[in-house]
Amino acid sequence: MLTVALPKGALLKESIRLFQAIGLDFSGFLDPANRQLQIVAPTGNAQALLVRTQDVPVYVEYGQAQLGIVGYDVLREKNPQVAHLLDLQFGRCRLSVAVKQASPYRCSLDLPPHSRVASKFVHCARAYFEQMDLPVEVVPLYGSVELGPLTGMSEAIVDLVSTGRTLKENGLVELEVLFESTARLIAHPLSYRLNRFGLHQPIEQIQALLSSPVP
């Protein structure tokens, strides 16, 4: 049976809507009373796993799921061995460097050498500043990253920005964008090559949906 890894959180609703559009209904995950982490589609030919966003590529890489939906930001940070198939064009956001609005910094290169930068995207942040030849200390933080500059623990943060509202409400401002991120369809490489569980069919259906003109 085809297994799909779906991400908890912001991408879940659109991910379920996408699979519904090709005849695979996993909407039970949206029921507030639901406690199941594994749901079989009514058609009986596919099941979905509900997992943390960061775990989606792990399930796909190890073959417990043949397909998955995950943000490009996670793929950049984790660099998993998966097949990158389609840009699904939802869940749009960006990974940015931000500092306190009152700070004197106007671009990333204004940061003093050996500044502290708080982020849960440790590898992306480190690679970005290494590319700029600016030595910084990347401090791993996995919640309320905005508190880094506010408490003086870090001069800057590297974090996902969608509307920018959270930054603004916390007195922070974007300096630069590392990259844009959207939801991506990924697959287990060997399963994709061998077309296990008829994997190519849902992929082609999703591709056709993305190519069709918006009414």
Swiss-Prot record:
Molecular function per GO = ATP binding; ATP phosphoribosyltransferase activity
Q: Which domain of life is it from?
A: Bacteria
**A Pfam short name:** HisG
- Signal peptide start-end: none
Which CDD domains is this protein grouped with? PBP2_HisGs (cd13595)
A GO BP term here is:
L-histidine biosynthetic process
The protein's Enzyme Commission number: 2.4.2.17
The subcellular localization recorded is: Cytoplasm
Query: Which reactions is this enzyme annotated as catalysing?
Result: 1-(5-phospho-beta-D-ribosyl)-ATP + diphosphate = 5-phospho-alpha-D-ribose 1-diphosphate + ATP
**One GO location term (cellular component):** cytoplasm
The record's family statement is: Belongs to the ATP phosphoribosyltransferase family. Short subfamily.
Question: What does this protein do, in the record's words?
Answer: Catalyzes the condensation of ATP and 5-phosphoribose 1-diphosphate to form N'-(5'-phosphoribosyl)-ATP (PR-ATP). Has a crucial role in the pathway because the rate of histidine biosynthesis seems to be controlled primarily by regulation of HisG enzymatic activity.
- UniProt protein name: ATP phosphoribosyltransferase
Organism, by scientific name, is: Cyanothece sp. (strain PCC 7425 / ATCC 29141)
Please spell out the taxonomic lineage of the organism that makes this protein.
Bacteria, Bacillati, Cyanobacteriota, Cyanophyceae, Gomontiellales
